[in-house]
Structure formats: structure tokens, C-alpha cells
């Protein structure tokens, strides 16, 4: 077999794109199921009173529906963030390192998930969100410094 006849290797980026789109779809599907299940136990709310959902969740939580909601948010945000970050890294940070893109996508998903959890428990504040964001950004900066030194 000569060099011209060698089989072409399957591009790894296509596999990563497939995984990111699958995570995005899984998150979207899980969120649609979690929305149909009530995140609280008890009678359904009348239409137009969605503002009462946090109070009902705190009064009688439906743990499987909340777990599905939080897991779906994590999967969907990870997939969406990966697609956006991959494009940004392709434009500005060549060569693109897959581990860095996945790590940043997961950190963004952790940030969004923590904000969703805080909002669900009515403990969300802009100052707390900024503190969490600064902590995660510093973590990413320190990880980039460590990887660069190795």
C-alpha cells in the first residue's frame, strides 16, 4: 500500500462535533421531559402562574424531576458551549487543543448549573454570580498556566 492508497483517518473533530450535538439534543429532550413533569409534587398550577413554581418546588420537591432538569441543563449547556468555544478557538487560538475546549465548556456548564440551582432556591444574586464567575475564570487561568509549564 502506497502513501496515496492509505485509508483516510476519520477526523477527530467530527466525533467531537457529534458528541456536542448529541449532548445538546439530550439536554433539550431532557428539559422538555422535565418541564412536562412537575418539579414539585401536588396539584398543577393554573395557567399564567409560573412565578409560583419556586415556592411550590421548595414546599414539596420532586427530586427525580429536579435531577433530570439539572442534568439536562448541564448536558445542553456543555454541548452548546463546546460548539461556540470550538469556533472561537479555531479562529483565535491555533492549534486547537480538544481538552481545553471541553474543559472550558464544562466550566461554563458548571457556572450555569450553579446559577440555576441558586435561582431555584431563591438565593441568586448578581454579586454571588460574579464571585462564582471570577472563581471559575481563575481556575481556568491557573490550569492554562499549569498546562503551558508542562
Predicted regions span which residues?
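Hydrophobic, membrane-inserted alpha-helices
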Residues: 108-117, 133-136
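Juxtamembrane membrane-interface segments at transmembrane alpha-helix termini
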Residues: 139-150
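Membrane-helix boundary elements
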Residues: 23-76
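Short juxtamembrane and helix-loop transition motifs at transmembrane-helix boundaries
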Residues: 61-68, 85-98
